[in-house]
Amino acid sequence: RWWQAFNTRYNVYFNGAQAYIDGSLEKEKGNKDNFTELIPLYTVGNKNSRDLGKSNFNRAIEKAEKAIAKHSIKKRPEWTKNRRKTDKDIEWLSRREYNPFLWKAWMLMGRSQFHQGAFEEAAATFAYMSRMYKGQTAIYGKARAWLAKCYIEQGWLYDAEDVIRNMQLDSMDWRAVKEWDYTYADYYLHTGELAKAVPYLQKVIKHEMRQKQKARELYLLGQVYAALGKRQDAYEAFQRVIRTNPPYELEFNARIAQTEVMAEGQSKQMISKLRHMAASDNNKEYLDQVYYAMGNIHLANKDTLAAINAYELGRKKTRSGIEKGVLLLHLGDLYWAKERFGNAKKCYDEALGLLDRDRKDYEQLSDRSKILDELAPYTDAVQLQDSLQQLAKCSEKER
C-alpha cells in the first residue's frame, strides 16, 4: 500500500497535477469578465472562457485515470479473527479503496472536468467519490461540496439544495469547511440571496491564495454590496481590489464602480473623476465605459438630456463589446421612452449584435427591434413632415 501510494503521488499524479495548474493559469490569464453584470465566482461561469486550458485539463484527467487504473487497491487487508475490532478498525475494513493517496487522483479528475465546463461528468465523478469514501468524513465532505458546485453551475439548484440540506444534517469534518464556504457562496449568488452570500464570500476571500482570483472575488463582493445598497462597503471593497495591484482592466472597472457607489450629493465629484479618467491615455480602450458611467450618474439625478449626451459620446467610441452593447441598450431605452423611434431603432439594431442571447432583457430588446422595423418608416415620415412644417413657418432669414 505504501509503495502504490508513493508511485501514485510522485509519478503519474505529479504530472497530472502540473497539467491542472497550467490549465488553471491559462484560464485565469485569458478570462474576460463582463463587468456590467455580477461576475461569476468561478471563471468557468463565463461561457467564453470555458475552452481555455482545455488541453491541459484533458491531460490532467488522463493522468488521474491512469493513476486510478494502475494503483487502486481493492483487496481488503487480512484480519486476525480473534483480535477485537474497534470502531476505527470497522471503518478501515469497510473501505472500498485502500490506497491512501488515490482520493487525490479522483479529486484531480473531478476538478479538471469541472473547470473545463464538463459539469455532468464532474458530477458523476464526485457522486462516485461520495459513495466510495462515505466513511472518511473529510474526503466525503469535499466530494459533496464539489458535487453541489457542479449542480449549481448547471443551474440545477434544487439538486444542489438537496445535497446542501443533507450535508447540514451530517457532522461536517473541519477539513471540508473551506470547500463548503465556496459552495455556499456560489449557491447564494445563483439563487439571488445576496445578503446570505456576503459572509461566505468574505471567508472565500480569506481562503484564496491566488492574487488575481482574490481581486475578482473582492470585486464581486463590491458588486454584491452595491446591489444591497451598502454603498460605503461597496466602495471599500472596490478600493481593496485596487490595492491588490490587479490587471489593468480589473483595476479600471473597480475605479469606475467606485464612482457609481459614491455617496449621494457627490455627483460633481464623480463626474470630475470620470472626466479625469477619460483624459488619460491608459483608458482610450475603455472610453465607452467611462461615458456610460457618466450617463448613469446623470440619469440618477433625473437629467435625461445629459445622460443621452454622455451615452452618445460613448457610442461614438470604436470598441465593440458587451459593455458598448449595454450602453446602446440603455440609450435605445431612453429614445424609446421619448418616442424618438428612429434613434431607438439604430441603437437596438447595433446592440443586438453585441449582447449575449442569454441576457434576461434580450427578448424584450429583440421584440422592440422587430416592432421598430415596422414602425420606424412611419415615424420618420411624421418627423420629416413636422420638420418641413416648422421650416415653412420660419421667415426667409430664419431658414
Give the predicted meaning of each segment:
Residues R1-R399:
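Acidic, polar-rich low-complexity tracts and alpha-helical solenoid repeat scaffolds
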